[in-house]
């Protein structure tokens, strides 16, 4: 049973996973990847967010995030990114969430309290509120995407870890696969407010692709 009096790695990851899920819904709404009438207003982290009401899309997002959470529990993930891809399979935008601070530990320690000196608090809610508000302001201020695009969730692994096979098969379009070590993003980078989840710190930023080579 998860310890409710202190922070555990699993608790940090679960809270991050929920934040990632909410962020994906908001980004898909703001960037108009689906008709906006498929989304409804909801409240999360003491602010207004947007949530898809289409059951198939909701199920898919939950499946993708759950697979991401399972990989995060191994401590192998450097960062998670929602990537918006155009019809030519070129990346238009990337929304990046760093996860470097998640340690590599045995499974049996995932629910163990990290430190008795750092009790569990809900202070992270305010970080998430501020970050989501800023993220929505940034996405709403970006130029509209002029053509039909799709999206995928990418994981970049820490050095020395192979890419999980299921990420190749399920979530990465064949033409969009990349070698993370050789990828150089050409465009602008917009920082978003960091989120602290207890001992876990997540940096967030937006990368906007430009057509210049």
Curated annotation (Swiss-Prot):
The keyword DNA damage applies. One of its GO terms (cellular component) is cytosol. InterPro entries: HORMA_dom, HORMA_dom_sf, Mad2-like. It is found in: Mitochondrion; Nucleus. It comes from the Eukaryota. Residues 10-206 form the HORMA domain. SUPFAM superfamilies: The spindle assembly checkpoint protein mad2. Keywords: DNA damage, DNA repair, Mitochondrion, Nucleus. One of its GO terms (biological process) is error-free translesion synthesis. Required for DNA damage induced mutagenesis. Involved in DNA repair, mitochondrial DNA repair and translesion synthesis. Has a role in the bypass of abasic (AP) sites. Belongs to the MAD2 family. Forms DNA polymerase zeta with rev3. This is DNA polymerase zeta processivity subunit. It comes from Schizosaccharomyces pombe (strain 972 / ATCC 24843) (Fission yeast). The lineage of its organism: Eukaryota, Fungi, Dikarya, Ascomycota, Taphrinomycotina. The gene is rev7.
